């Protein structure tokens, strides 16, 4: 069974994370890249939805157990490969010539929330799940690129509160501050609304992709030029 599945619903590509808490490690990053590449290779695809198979978690963020194991075994190349591969996932979402929609059907912690912020739009169910950045409590700073694209998705005043407090925020509050498009009643309603929204798009890839390239040019520059300053020496912990 794949940890990330790709399916088509008409012209909408649905990428489903299917590994429990969907903690992010090198295998996860490679699977996400492959799924996105395959989705975009299909010229009939007009939108992409990223969601989770589970009821409780969208993604619990970085696989800290895997990361500590890599550190303890001095497998630094794996750590670097993971971080660069996740940056590739983020850049593909930021530059995809079709809308990328996160259907957040459970907890989105840390890198899980960050992944959703790389998407163009977000929907989240209200009956279960929190959205938060616990990095301040686990002493793992954001990379510069992450800061840049999260700020496109979350108003500065709210991101300032969330990143410095680690506060857990539920869907209704996220909707109030325009971080998500809609707080949905449950998973069924979430997928119905996210898919209905995805189907409203049938834009030409050329102009849609060019708009995203121009919108996010500065973010891509930060990811490519500033992130390696922290990734190469693995200067990741505060």
Q: What does each of the following model-derived ranges do?
A:
Residues 50, 115-116, 174, 194:
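Hydrophobic/aromatic residues within transmembrane alpha-helices
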């Amino acid at each position: 069974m794949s940890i990330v599945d790709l399916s088509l619903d008409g012209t909408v590509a649905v990428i489903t994370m299917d590994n429990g808490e969907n903690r992010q490690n090198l295998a996860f990053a490679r699977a996400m890249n492959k799924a996105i590449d395959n989705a975009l290779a299909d010229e009939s695809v007009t939108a992409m939805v990223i969601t989770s198979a589970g009821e409780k978690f969208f993604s619990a963020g970085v696989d800290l157990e895997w990361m500590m194991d890599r550190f303890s075994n001095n497998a630094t190349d794996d750590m670097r490969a993971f971080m660069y591969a996740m940056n590739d996932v983020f850049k593909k979402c930021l530059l995809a010539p079709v809308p990328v929609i996160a259907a957040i059907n459970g907890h989105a912690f840390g890198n899980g929330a960050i992944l959703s912020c790389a998407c163009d739009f977000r929907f989240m169910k209200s009956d279960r799940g929190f959205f938060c950045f616990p990095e301040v409590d686990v002493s793992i700073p954001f990379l510069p690129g992450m800061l840049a694209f999260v700020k496109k998705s979350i108003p500065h005043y709210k991101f300032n509160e969330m990143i410095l407090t680690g506060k857990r925020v539920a869907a209704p509050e996220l909707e109030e501050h325009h971080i998500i498009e809609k707080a949905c009643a449950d998973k069924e309603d979430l997928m119905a609304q996210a898919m209905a929204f995805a189907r409203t798009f049938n834009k030409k890839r050329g102009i849609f992709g060019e708009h995203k390239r121009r919108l996010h040019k500065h973010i891509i520059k930060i990811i490519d030029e500033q992130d390696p300053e922290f990734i190469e020496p693995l200067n990741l912990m505060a």
